[in-house]
């Protein structure tokens, strides 16, 4: 058997020899093999010795924890019968022998061995076998030691402690936070503590108690590097209180030796006791800083600071100040006597007595009192080594009283009473506030007076020796009287230095303002302009208190790295050109209840700056959602060393690659697929690509764009390599990086890279400090700031009305309260493009129809309508509509028709609920926008609207670039159903008269002369594109072939499609007939998708609109409508027509009177808006793809919409600057030359903008405005009220006794109103009659505009006198 290890043997008792231990170890720790077990007793014994854990495959001998006393182990026999104890828990590092017992795998039943005294938590005796369980304690936790150690490697009763961190109990209730520090190290440690290395960055209280007996440390000496932050902080609302209690006497009880200066010790640090260490002098403590034993109390805007440094009780020893106390921002006072050998006895070198000032502020009145009872606190001679530069400790006593607009300051320096010693001023007093002159300031109205008096003889008691000239020395400042009356300012200076100083004054240089001085500004007036900033000295502390408005600081107040700047701004209108940059080492306490102090032009680069606190929180939460992160396909792997975005927690992100289409199959190449490009020089620079499936099917050589391409020479590329990377931006406040899209950063506003960007997180903190107000007020950044048009006003008001009705119906259908039904918020509808364009007809198509006078071009107006919804503070574009309007000035067949060109949407509409009819609210809103547009066109006199239900292919975009992945692309059937549902609603609202399709309207008609010239011609329409291709095919055929094909046609087709009735046709007629025949075959399968919507009836034969007069129609034939002229010229018998197809069956005709529409012509006097971005659908899509304005995620949709609005506002500013005029709103004087307004129909020069018209209800009662606003000085439409007003004046003078005999319009109706008013029984009962109320409303309008003093209208003169008295 091998002997035990050496390290184990060294730890054994000396009287136990090696042979005995070997025999003992053999009996206890060696087990027989399983194959050698012969008896049941041996098997049971072997089973009990096996390890319980399955992971421990290797069995090793368990070394016992032998305890003292060892005198019982006197022989091997006693060992064999000994009873041993195994520890289960140990809190301290143990000797090597005990470590072996800790890691043991097996244990053996032995006789009892007496255990040594200790702190074992659990013991087992006899046959109880226990495996030791040790807890792993972190270095930051407390370490306890008990007992004695005889190990040579460790000193007895000494613990090396590196940090006592965070033994603090923190309680937070609401906005109130309390911290309590309780370091009862006596109870926890109980031993000597040796601090080996300085506790750097130990932010909590660290305290040590006990005595040290370790050899590495001196006896009863503790090396302390920092006693920081034993402070109890209580915060209640806006009131914060700090109390510092350093009872080091009770906690330490030993001598404290401060080895190095306590740098950056921001809280109170105090030392007590005596030092017996060899490195420090007897009973001398080296103190480098006694800082901030200050109790601060803040109530509302009132802040009070009290300084109490009772060093006598806390120190009780001599204080030796080795070096000057730099960066000591609070009151620093020293007491006692010095017995150090390097310094004189009972002399303290003082470099600064700063700011023992009590400040009290009540409302706009601020009072400061300085009390330096140095006699009681110091009691020793004060030696001022260097001049006190802006020494706040010797600052004069200032009493400030502010009553109304009168401001008074009084200063008194009783240095004799406070110091009690002679003051030796070595160098001249440069702005020494301790000897600052007494200033009395009086402000009465706009007059300000300042009086200064330097009674230095009385205050200092010594002669004043001025070595150098006084450069703006506030202590010797001249007496200045300033008077400000209106715009005239007068200053008077009087230098009575003989009286004040007692010596001659030699002024060598002008008094320049010393940057080291401290300026105390208390301004209660307006328009105070400080040309240069108040620069803060490194040693001084700047306290700025601005209680006024209109203070314009040209340059910022720069904060020194060492000083603390306390800024208390309770006003607004403070405009600082550059921000106040605070050093990292300094603490800036900012209390701002007003607008941000940053320059607005330098902060207008992020849209988040206009958000409220709630909007910023919602925006940040939306970026943290996992769906936002996973939606990005092109996200790169985030490396370990790569910095992630602070807002979305993602690294480098990629935009979706630009869409590429295969030249052979015209399909879009997937974003992550491969494609091939030709390597030939002829096609290398062009964008020609082939998808992988087409490349695999191609031959070795194949033609492409007129060039033969070698398949093996083509280059393989990845579409994912074409993706762009999202750009980053760094916050100027926290210096963290975010994606420009996450931070809603607008780089177009920071092209010169001089603007300051603040991230949403920092803006949230700033927003919380200014009472939930937007930091920057953008006046031209939202969708509502876009100019309104007549169409947008009509659609928006109609949409809001319909949403209210839907909400009421949903609440009624579901049985809920109307407040429980969510409504969409933040909807804004604007027309962003409206311009006149011309559609050019294909030359071959125009030459084919030249005999029918088919025009070569069609003028129309193109419009783009966008719907925005504010989501998390951002106006997101959720719906887009492109339309073309062909007005009454256009030729047939496009006259008075509109074409729904394209529409598109993204699925970000809120809320996501269903209506009472069971459809999505999002669908309801989009339907109402379309129905509203059709109604607007109907009122303007349009007769027909054409819709082509053609959905985009999967992966293809119509208007908005890159839709969300969760949004499904509808097929043709779903899209057609969507349009049919919308048209059914329009028919129920009597907006649409009839809905048919293109085939039934033009190809299956019962009337004659249905040729290609009757078909409307639109850009990009289904039938127009097909017709152009068919004409090219017809032109390739010869005339003989055309004649043969005409003979194959039926006689009915030839007669229906030809103008001639003789039966002879020429070549052009043949081409026309063949074209209509081919178009009919193409249109018939898709006729349900080609919808024709009739807004107003038009004549089937002449295609003219039937807007007034009689309209003849057939009840059996849906598409037959005749005007009066066509009916009179017809060959049928009066009152009937012949149905041609069914053997000339005769149908009866009916007639109806048509009421005229509001507009006789479709002339559009709305605002003209032009920009290159929305010139066409393809232009906007290409613009979005170029700048990566996509909508596939919410974060991208926010940023893209923000940038689109920026481009719109920029183009509108340029447009308004060119078209602005003197046309303004009469009420608010707003320029309405480039927007819409409401003109009064009675007052020729009175006009109201949309804001005044909407908000001012009285204005609408006193003036007569049209139903729709006007624009571009267009003449307004008359209304019914104007006709009634004219009829009232006529009816009172009318001589006809009967109403039927008078031909004046509305005369008999007005007379009936007056008769009813006299005989009304409802009004006589005291209740309100609606008919009488409407009459008196009309009379009130008449009174407001009537200029006749003898007006015969009833009550006109009485009401006019009342109106004059009010004015």
Swiss-Prot record:
Q: Where does Zn(2+) 2 bind?
A: 1225, 1228, 1249, 1252
The Gene Ontology biological process annotation of the record reads:
chromatin organization; regulation of DNA-templated transcription
Main localisation = nucleus
Identify one Gene Ontology CC term for this UniProt entry.
nucleus
Reaction catalysed by this chain? L-lysyl-[protein] + acetyl-CoA = N(6)-acetyl-L-lysyl-[protein] + CoA + H(+)
Q: Which GO terms describe its molecular function?
A: protein-lysine-acetyltransferase activity; zinc ion binding
**Positions of PHD-type zinc fingers:** 688-765
Q: List the disulfide bonds.
A: none
Q: What class of enzyme is it?
A: transferase
Q: Per its record, how is this protein called by name?
A: Histone acetyltransferase HAC2
């Amino acid at each position: 058997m091998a002997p035990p290890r050496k390290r184990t043997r060294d730890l054994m008792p000396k009287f136990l020899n090696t042979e005995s231990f070997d025999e003992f170890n053999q009996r206890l720790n060696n087990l027989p093999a399983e194959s050698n077990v012969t008896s049941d007793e041996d098997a049971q014994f072997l089973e009990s010795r096996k390890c319980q854990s399955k992971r421990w495959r290797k069995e090793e001998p368990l070394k016992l924890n032998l305890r003292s006393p060892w005198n019982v182990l006197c022989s091997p026999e006693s060992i064999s019968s000994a009873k041993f104890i195994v520890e289960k828990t140990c809190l301290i590092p143990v000797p090597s022998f005990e470590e072996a017992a800790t890691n043991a795998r097996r244990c053996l039943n032995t006789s009892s061995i007496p255990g040594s005294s200790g702190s074992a938590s659990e013991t087992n005796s006899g046959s109880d076998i226990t495996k030791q369980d040790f807890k792993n304690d972190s270095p930051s936790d407390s370490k306890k030691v008990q007992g004695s150690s005889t190990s040579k490697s460790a000193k007895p009763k000494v613990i090396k402690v590196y940090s006592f961190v965070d033994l603090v109990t923190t309680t937070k209730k609401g906005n109130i936070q309390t911290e309590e520090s309780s370091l009862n190290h006596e109870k926890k440690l109980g031993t000597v503590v040796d601090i080996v290395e300085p506790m750097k960055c130990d932010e909590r209280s660290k305290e040590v108690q006990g005595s040290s007996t370790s050899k590495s440390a001196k006896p009863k000496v503790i090396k302390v590097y920092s006693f920081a932050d034993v402070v109890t902080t209580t915060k209640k609302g806006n009131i914060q209180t700090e109390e510092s209690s350093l009872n080091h006497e009770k906690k330490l009880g030993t001598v404290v030796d401060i080895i190095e200066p306590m740098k950056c010790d921001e809280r109170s640090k105090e030392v007590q006791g005596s030092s017996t260490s060899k490195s420090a002098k007897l009973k001398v403590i080296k103190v480098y800083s006694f800082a901030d034993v200050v109790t601060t109390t803040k109530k509302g805007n009132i802040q009070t600071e009290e300084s109490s440094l009772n060093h006598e009780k806390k120190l009780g020893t001599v204080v030796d100040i080795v070096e000057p106390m730099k960066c000591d921002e609070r009151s620093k006072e020293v007491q006692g006597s010095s017995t150090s050998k390097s310094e004189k006895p009972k002399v303290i070198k003082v470099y600064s007595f700063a700011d023992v000032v009590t400040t009290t502020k009540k409302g706009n009145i601020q009072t400061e009192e300085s009390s330096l009872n140095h006699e009681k606190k110091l009691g020793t001679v004060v030696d001022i080594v260097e001049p006190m530069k802006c020494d706040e400790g010797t600052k004069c006593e200032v009493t400030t009283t502010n009553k109304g607009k009168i401001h008074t300051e009084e200063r008194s320096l009783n240095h004799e009473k406070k110091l009690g010693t002679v003051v030796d001023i070595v160098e001249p007093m440069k702005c020494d506030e301790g000897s600052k002159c007494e200033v009395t300031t009086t402000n009465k109205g706009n007059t300000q007076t300042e009086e200064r008096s330097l009674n230095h003889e009385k205050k200092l008691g010594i002669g004043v020796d001025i070595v150098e000239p006084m450069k703006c020395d506030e202590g010797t400042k001249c007496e200045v009287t300033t008077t400000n009356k209106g715009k005239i300012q007068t200053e008077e200076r009087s230098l009575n230095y003989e009286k004040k100083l007692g010596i001659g004054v030699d002024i060598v240089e002008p008094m320049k303002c010393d940057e080291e001085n401290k300026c105390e500004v208390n301004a209660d007036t307006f328009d105070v302009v400080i040309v240069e900033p108040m620069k803060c000295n490194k040693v001084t502390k700047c306290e700025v208190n601005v209680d006024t408005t209109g203070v314009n600081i040209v340059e910022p107040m720069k904060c020194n790295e060492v000083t603390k700047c306390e800024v208390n701004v309770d006003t607004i209108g403070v405009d600082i050109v550059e921000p106040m940059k605070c050093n990292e080492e300094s603490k800036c306490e900012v209390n701002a209840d007003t607008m941000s102090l940053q320059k607005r032009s330098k902060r207008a680069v992020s849209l988040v700056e206009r958000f409220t606190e709630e909007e910023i929180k919602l925006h940040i939460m939306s970026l943290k959602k996992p769906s936002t992160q996973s939606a990005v396909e092109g996200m790169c792997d985030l490396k370990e060393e790569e910095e992630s975005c602070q807002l979305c927690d993602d690294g480098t992100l990629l935009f979706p690659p630009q869409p590429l289409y295969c030249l052979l199959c015209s399909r879009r190449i997937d974003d992550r697929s491969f494609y091939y490009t030709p390597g030939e020089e002829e096609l290398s620079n062009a964008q020609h690509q082939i998808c992988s499936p087409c490349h695999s099917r191609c031959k070795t050589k194949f033609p492409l764009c007129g060039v033969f391409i070698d398949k093996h020479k083509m280059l393989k590329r990845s579409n994912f390599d074409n993706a762009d990377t999202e750009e980053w931006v760094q916050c100027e406040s926290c210096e963290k990086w975010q994606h420009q899209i996450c931070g809603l950063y607008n780089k177009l506003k920071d092209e010169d890279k001089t603007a300051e960007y603040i991230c949403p997180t920092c803006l949230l903190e700033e927003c919380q400090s200014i009472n939930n107000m937007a930091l920057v007020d953008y006046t031209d950044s939202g969708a509502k700031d876009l100019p309104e048009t007549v169409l947008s006003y009509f659609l928006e008001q109609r949409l809001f009305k319909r949403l209210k009705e839907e909400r009421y119906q949903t609440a009624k259908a579901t049985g809920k309260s109307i407040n429980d039904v969510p409504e969409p918020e933040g909807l804004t509808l604007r027309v962003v493009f409206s311009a006149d364009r011309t559609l050019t007809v294909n030359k071959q198509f125009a030459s084919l129809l030249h005999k029918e006078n088919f025009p070569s071009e069609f003028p129309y107006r193109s419009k783009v309508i966008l719907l925005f919804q504010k989501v998390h503070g951002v106006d997101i574009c959720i719906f887009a509509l492109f339309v073309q309007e062909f007005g009454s000035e256009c030729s047939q067949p496009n006259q008075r028709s509109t074409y729904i060109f394209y529409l598109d949407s993204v699925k970000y509409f809120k809320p996501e609920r269903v209506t009472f009819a069971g459809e999505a609210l999002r669908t309801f809103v989009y339907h109402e926008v379309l129905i509203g547009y059709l109604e607007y066109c109907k009122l303007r006199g349009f007769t027909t609207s054409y819709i082509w239900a053609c959905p985009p292919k999967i992966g293809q975009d119509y208007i908005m670039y890159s839709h969300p992945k969760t949004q499904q692309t509808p097929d043709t059937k779903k899209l057609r159903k969507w349009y049919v549902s919308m048209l059914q609603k329009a028919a129920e609202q009597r907006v649409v008269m009839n809905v048919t399709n293109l085939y039934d309207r033009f190809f299956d008609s019962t009337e004659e002369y249905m040729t290609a010239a009757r078909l409307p011609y639109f850009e990009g329409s289904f039938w127009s594109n097909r017709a152009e291709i068919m004409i090219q095919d017809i032109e390739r055929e010869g005339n003989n072939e055309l004649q043969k094909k005409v003979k194959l046609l039926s006689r009915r087709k030839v007669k229906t499609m030809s103008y001639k009735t003789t039966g002879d046709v020429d070549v052009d007629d043949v081409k026309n007939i063949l074209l209509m025949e081919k178009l009919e075959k193409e249109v018939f399968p898709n006729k349900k998708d080609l919808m024709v919507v009739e807004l107003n009836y038009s004549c089937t034969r002449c295609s003219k609109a039937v807007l007034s007069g009689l309209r003849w129609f057939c009840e059996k034939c849906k598409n037959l409508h005749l005007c009066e002229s066509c009916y009179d010229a017809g060959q049928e018998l009066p009152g009937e027509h012949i149905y041609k197809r069914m053997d000339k069956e005769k149908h009866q005709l009916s007639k109806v009177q048509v009421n005229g529409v509001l507009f006789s012509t479709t002339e559009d006097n709305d605002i003209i808006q032009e920009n290159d971005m929305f010139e066409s659908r393809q232009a906007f899509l290409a613009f979005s793809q170029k700048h990566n304005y996509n909508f596939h995620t919410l974060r991208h949709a926010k940023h893209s919409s923000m940038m689109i609005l920026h481009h719109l506002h920029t183009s509108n500013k340029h447009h308004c600057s060119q078209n602005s005029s003197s046309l303004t709103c009469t009420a608010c004087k707003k320029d309405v030359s480039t927007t819409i307004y409401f003109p009064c129909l009675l007052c020729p020069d009175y006009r109201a903008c949309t804001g005044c018209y909407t908000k001012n209800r009285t204005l609408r009662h006193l003036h007569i405005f049209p139903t729709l606003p006007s624009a571009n000085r267009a003449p307004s439409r008359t209304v019914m009220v104007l006709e009634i007003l004219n009829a009232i004046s006529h009816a009172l003078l009318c001589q006809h006794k009967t109403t039927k005999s008078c031909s004046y319009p509305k005369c008999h109706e007005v007379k009936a109103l007056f008769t009813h008013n006299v005989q009304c029984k409802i009004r006589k009962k005291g209740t309100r009659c609606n008919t009488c109320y409407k009459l008196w409303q009309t009379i009130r309008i008449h009174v407001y505009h009537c200029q006749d003093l003898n007006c015969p209208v009833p009550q006109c003169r009485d009401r006019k006198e009342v109106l004059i008295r009010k004015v």
